[in-house]
């Protein structure tokens, strides 16, 4: 009888232990050539295109006029005088631009007329544009190696932190498993000891005492493991945040030097083929962004409308949607097919710091995965600058 009772208690303990176990995210020549009115016709494979009207005279249809205005604004803000002259005085460069922008002949002709006028204005406004461009190039060639070295060091340290977090987390996980095992063993021995007490006249207390000791050891192991994990995470957060701040400060050095004259830095692009097609693809992005906006049902009805003149020479008014900037809408378009050289530095540097907001957010995370993402993001920014440094260096050696 006692044997059967002992067997039932043992089965009960094993069943309870099993129950606990089971519950457990990227032309320096030619101001004069522009003055000579270089031929503006460009064959884009669209011979049936009809004239749009004269943009400067305000006789163009409203939608095409708005596109020309957006394109002129883009060239004013994002393209250097040197590169604009190159585009307008080299027919091959212009044809490459038009092809990349996917412009029909009528729009290409009107855009070129508007750009001829813009080039004259830019030359008259800034006679020292060549000297400024050279100044920016010299600064970048001198300072970038230092910035690169410091950024690479920060990236290595971030990855080391991520590896450290993984190791500590793995260690504390093992400790927690050991703690759990000890706790289970403690529970079994304690239950067995208590269950056998009525049948062994106190002899089962021999099992009860080690069970309680194992329980205390399990509790201490769990507390120590959790404390180690929390301490490591807190320390890692502080270190990662410091590294990200230092890295962003390095990126800011580039932006602060360029200041309001960021467009002149575009002259660092040494590859005419890539330059002209890159600008063309950005203009294509402007057209697509506008087309997408117009294709949204009731989009125009959901925004207030304002009336503006098409041009300074014309009193004609057109109704225009008070909409988000097309430049802002197209900023997220990546020129991935221009890789591996990211010549369009202005798109990658002007907003380099501001687009890095999530680097701060990543630095607040204690996980190894997030730290690795932060390191990867910094490395991508560094690669953009490094590609441009190589272009400048090769151009200087010619």
From Swiss-Prot:
Any one GO MF annotation of this record: lipid binding
Stretch forming the signal peptide: 1-27
Post-translational modification: Phosphorylated by FAM20C in the extracellular medium.
Protein's cellular compartments: Secreted
Coiled coil stretches, renumbered: none
InterPro entries per record: ApoL
Glycosylation sites: 261
Effect of residue 188 to T: In a breast cancer sample; somatic mutation
Chain positions found as Phosphoserine: 311, 314
Membership in a protein family: Belongs to the apolipoprotein L family.
Protein name stated in the entry: Apolipoprotein L1
Organism annotation: Homo sapiens
Taxonomic lineage: Eukaryota, Metazoa, Chordata, Craniata, Vertebrata
Gene: APOL1
């Amino acid at each position: 009888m006692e044997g059967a009772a002992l067997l039932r208690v043992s089965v009960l303990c094993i069943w309870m232990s099993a129950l606990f176990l089971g519950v457990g995210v990227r032309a320096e020549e030619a101001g004069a050539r522009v003055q000579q009115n270089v031929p503006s016709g460009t064959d884009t494979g669209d011979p049936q295109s009809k004239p749009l009207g004269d943009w400067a005279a305000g006789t163009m249809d409203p939608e095409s006029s708005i596109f020309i205005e957006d394109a002129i604004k883009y060239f004013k803000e994002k393209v250097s005088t040197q590169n604009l002259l190159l585009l307008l005085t080299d027919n091959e460069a212009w044809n490459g631009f038009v092809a990349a922008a996917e412009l029909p002949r009528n729009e290409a002709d009107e855009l070129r007329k508007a750009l001829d006028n813009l080039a004259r204005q830019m030359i008259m406004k800034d006679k020292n544009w060549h000297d400024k461009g050279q100044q920016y190039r010299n600064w970048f060639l001198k300072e970038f190696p230092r910035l690169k070295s410091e950024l690479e060091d920060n990236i290595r340290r971030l990855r080391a932190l991520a590896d450290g977090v993984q190791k500590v987390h793995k260690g504390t996980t093992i400790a927690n498993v050991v703690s759990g095992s000890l706790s289970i063993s403690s529970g079994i021995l304690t239950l067995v000891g208590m269950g056998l007490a009525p049948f062994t006249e106190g002899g089962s207390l021999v099992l009860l005492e080690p069970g309680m000791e194992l329980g205390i050891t399990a509790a201490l192991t769990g507390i120590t493991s959790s404390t180690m994990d929390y301490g490591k995470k807190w320390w890692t957060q502080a270190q990662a945040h410091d590294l990200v701040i230092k890295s962003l400060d390095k990126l800011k050095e580039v932006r602060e030097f360029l200041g309001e004259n960021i467009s002149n830095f575009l002259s660092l692009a040494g590859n005419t083929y890539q330059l002209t097609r890159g600008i063309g693809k950005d203009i294509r992005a402007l057209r697509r962004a506008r087309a997408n906006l117009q294709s949204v049902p009731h989009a125009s009805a959901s925004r207030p409308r304002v009336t503006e003149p098409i041009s300074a020479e014309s009193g004609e008014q057109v109704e225009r949607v008070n909409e988000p900037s097309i430049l802002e809408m197209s900023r997220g378009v990546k020129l991935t097919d221009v890789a591996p050289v990211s010549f369009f530095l202005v798109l990658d540097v002007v907003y380099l710091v501001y687009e890095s907001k999530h680097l701060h957010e990543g630095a607040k995370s204690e996980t190894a995965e997030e730290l690795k993402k932060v390191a990867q993001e910094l490395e991508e920014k560094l690669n953009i600058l490094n590609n441009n440094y190589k272009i400048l260096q090769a151009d200087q050696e010619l």
